[in-house]
A protein has these predicted regions:
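Acidic, polar-rich low-complexity tracts and alpha-helical solenoid repeat scaffolds
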Residues: 1-234
Length: 234
């Protein structure tokens, strides 16, 4: 029985090969065209990969030179620092405009935002953090960019905007590594608005859901003042 099965399978394979062989004989030109087209497509893919890697490497080298020039200047006055920052931002933007993929294209806005943030230029930093989050919503850094833009809004005393951004994080990125941070920041925002019920709700989420979080101590301290404020009002 086993031998018969093997023979049947062998016959099927042989018949299939014969069909292919007959097709090739009957359609030599078509077969040749298919083979040539396949080879051309394969070569095109290889060339594309090589070009992609070469261009991305060239862009990264250029990007690193821009950052080295910006960070490498020491003992300069504030006007010179501002000029260096402006030039670096312009150069990164130009590099991004000329690229359609790769590290620089994906992360340029985040780099610019960080440069502005480190100089306490919160309006500009917020703009670029949000640009990055809009362009790369699936990036690991997208929730961090939105969180930073919310902090920038706080520095700019745009508290309603801050709350909206933290709520956006809760809606879209609650499964990110920033979950405890999101709850803590929302608690802070509601505490600032004297919404004790909502503030306590978010603080409790940290204490019950993340008992080993680095935010627990800060949360307990804030809840203590919440209780004090509540008693004071009564």
């Amino acid at each position: 029985m086993i031998k018969r099965d093997i023979e049947i399978q062998r016959n099927i394979v042989e018949k299939s090969l014969m069909v292919i062989k007959d097709f090739i004989k009957a359609h030599r030109r078509l077969t040749l065209s298919i083979i040539i087209s396949g080879m051309i497509a394969f070569i095109a893919v290889i060339i594309g990969i090589v070009y992609y890697e070469k261009r991305e490497n060239a862009e990264i080298i250029q990007y690193e030179r821009i950052l080295d020039k910006y960070h490498g200047s020491r003992d300069i006055n504030e006007a010179e620092k501002a000029a260096l920052l402006k030039n670096a931002v312009n150069d990164i933007n130009k590099l991004m405009d000329s690229s359609y993929w790769g590290f620089v294209h994906r992360n340029g806005y985040y780099t610019i935002a960080g440069m502005y943030y480190s100089q306490k230029m919160y309006k500009e930093a917020k703009e670029y953090f949000l640009k990055f989050a809009y362009r790369q919503p699936s990036s690991f850094f997208a929730p961090l960019a939105i969180q930073k833009s919310a902090v920038c809004s706080e520095y700019l005393q745009q508290y309603d905007e801050s709350l909206k951004l933290y709520q956006r994080l809760e809606r879209d990125y609650l499964d990110s590594p920033l979950t405890e941070q999101i709850y803590y920041d929302l608690g802070r925002m509601y505490q600032q608005r004297n919404d004790i019920f909502k503030a306590r709700e978010y603080y409790n989420k940290i204490i019950t859901g993340f008992p080993k979080s680095v935010f627990v101590k800060k949360t307990r301290d804030r809840m203590f003042f919440l209780g004090y404020s509540d008693k004071k009002e009564k």
